[in-house]
A protein has these predicted regions:
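A short, Trp-centered hydrophobic/proline-enriched beta-strand micro-motif
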Residues: 7-15, 59
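Active-site-adjacent elements of ketosynthase-type condensing enzymes
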Residues: 18-28
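Short glycine/proline-enriched turns and hinge-like loops at secondary-structure junctions
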Residues: 23-25, 49-54, 69-73, 98-100, ...
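A short core secondary-structure module
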Residues: 37, 41-90
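Glycine-rich phosphate/pyrophosphate-binding beta-alpha loops
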Residues: 45-51, 97, 134-138
Length: 233
């Protein structure tokens, strides 16, 4: 952690895969132990900051799904060097959120020392759960912030854009969708605050964190979409 806090190390978090999404137990990326190392092969997607990372926090399956009693078992977590000779990084072009790069990662015989495994083998899913709920709250807060920024730009444009001798913002067809966006963003923000409060108090917050992420994502997306349409007026 000290090198991360000092800015000497930059890390990316690699969990999501093309065909699994939130169904983390179905990850296909394999880490096969060979002596004092694991050999990793597979693919990840929507991985942030991989363009600049020199470290990677990686979740991979070390025991095949058909060999475990529960699907949450057999996943292991690693924190290791980002070897670009074994990891191909392909950036995903996005319409927004350009400040953070999003990427596809392709692992071909990527070697990870056993010492770079976090905790016990097969307990990775259990470990990441401790960080997933606060991450969901943070993502939800980000979505609300993006939506509010889009809304502020849309309303400013609606006040300045003059058509037929008056600002387009004086038309109810422009006003009502933006007002609806504002209400949805405010409601999502209250859900974010509720989830964050539950987490800070040490209470179970899984449902609230997921609800906040969903509501904020929907509200943020709709606000951005409406902002684009407003600028077309």
């Amino acid at each position: 952690l000290p090198p991360m806090a000092q800015g000497k190390d930059k890390a990316c978090f690699a969990v999501t895969e093309p065909n699994t999404g939130l169904n983390t137990t179905q990850l296909k990326t394999r880490a096969v132990r060979k002596g004092d190392r694991y050999v990793v092969n597979g693919q990840k997607v929507w991985i942030s900051t991989a363009q600049v990372a020199n470290k990677i926090l990686l979740l991979a399956r070390t025991t095949p799904l058909d060999e475990v009693k529960r699907p949450t078992e057999g996943l292991s977590l690693f924190y290791t060097d980002f070897d670009r000779s074994r990891i191909t990084v392909r950036e995903i072009d996005k319409m927004g959120r350009k400040i953070v790069d999003s990427n596809e990662l392709f692992f071909v015989d990527f070697e990870v020392p056993v010492d770079d495994r976090i905790g016990e083998e097969g307990k990775g899913f259990e470990y990441i759960l401790h960080g997933m709920n606060p991450e969901r709250v943070l993502i939800a807060a980000e979505a609300v912030g993006l939506g509010k920024l889009a809304l502020s730009r849309a309303t400013a444009y609606a006040k300045d854009r003059v058509v037929f001798n008056r600002p387009i913002g004086q038309n109810q067809a422009i006003q009502h969708p933006l007002a609806e966006n504002w209400m949805e963003l405010e409601a999502a923000w209250l859900m974010v605050l509720s989830a964050a409060s539950q987490y800070d108090k040490g209470l179970p917050c899984g449902a609230a964190a997921n609800a906040a992420k969903y509501l904020a994502g929907e509200a943020g997306y709709k606000a951005c979409q409406q902002a684009v349409m407003t600028h077309g007026g």
